[in-house]
């Protein structure tokens, strides 16, 4: 599979020759597709991880982030953030698009780039419903409807993918990594979520999950397994 993505074979440093820095909570969340893109494209990078800690009184301490939030030189302080040389940016999609542009994973034509952006938007819609439920005290009550809703969207994506290897074009784009990560998280939510209506996505997920670069990352110490933050009801 890697041969379909020549950009992944070139090691890349940050814009100033230093490793790219990703700042985010010590969870998958919005940070994981960024990490996967860095791994796939062969960037040198490092995690700066912030932790949400539950205190004895049941409240949550996020001071590891809030103590430094306005001291990092970010125009719009938020997590995740990316430091690439002298460039400091926030907002997940902006970060992904910047890295994809650098790595040649944004699509090769105007039509492909439009479809990549469409898949960004679709992923945001699905993720918002998933995250809203995961952090709700009514998660157990919401779970069946959430799974049904996600399964419907995945069935549409399965039809869009068809028998192709990649979601857009003839090679890997950032949209593939974005959706691989989401599907991987949804399989924790419900291991059967692809079984009835998504045979193409099952094969799609397996190809990325078993790619040597992804396997090496999953088996490394830097791989994070927690999906959502400590105060979530589905972690």
Functional labels for PLM-detected ranges:
Residues 116, 167-208, 218:
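GST superfamily/GST-like fold recognition
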Residues 136-142, 202-203, 221-229:
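Short alpha-helical linear motifs
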Residues 100, 104, 124, 162, ...:
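Hydrophobic/aromatic-lined pockets within catalytic cores
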Residues 2-154, 158, 165:
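GST-like domain detector, emphasizing the conserved glutathione-binding G-site
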Residues 105, 159-170, 212-218:
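Surface-exposed helix-capping loop/turn segments at secondary-structure junctions
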Residues 4, 214-235:
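C-terminal helix/juxtamembrane-tail motif
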Residues 119-122, 133, 180, 220-224:
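Short acidic/histidine-centered micro-motifs embedded in hydrophobic/aromatic stretches
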């Amino acid at each position: 599979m890697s041969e379909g993505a020549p950009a992944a074979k070139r090691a890349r440093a940050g814009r100033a020759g230093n490793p790219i820095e990703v700042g985010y909570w010590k969870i998958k969340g919005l940070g994981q597709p960024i990490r996967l893109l860095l791994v796939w494209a062969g960037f040198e990078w490092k995690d700066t991880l912030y932790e949400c800690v539950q205190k004895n009184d049941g409240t949550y301490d996020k001071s590891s982030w809030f103590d430094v939030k306005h001291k990092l030189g970010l125009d719009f302080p938020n997590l995740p953030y990316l430091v690439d040389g002298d460039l400091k940016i926030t907002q997940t999609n902006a970060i992904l698009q910047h890295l994809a542009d650098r790595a040649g994973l944004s699509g090769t034509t105007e039509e492909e780039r439009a479809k990549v952006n469409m898949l960004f938007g679709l992923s945001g819609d699905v993720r918002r419903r998933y995250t809203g439920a995961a952090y709700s005290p009514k998660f157990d009550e919401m779970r069946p409807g959430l799974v049904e809703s996600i399964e419907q969207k995945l069935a549409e994506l399965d039809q869009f993918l068809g028998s192709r290897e990649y979601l857009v074009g003839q090679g890997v784009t950032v949209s593939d990594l974005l959706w691989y990560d989401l599907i991987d998280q949804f399989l924790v939510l419900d291991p059967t979520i692809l079984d009835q209506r998504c045979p193409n996505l099952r094969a799609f997920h397996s190809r990325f999950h078993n790619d040597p670069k992804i396997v090496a990352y999953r088996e490394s110490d830097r791989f994070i397994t927690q999906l959502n933050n400590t105060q979530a009801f589905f972690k």
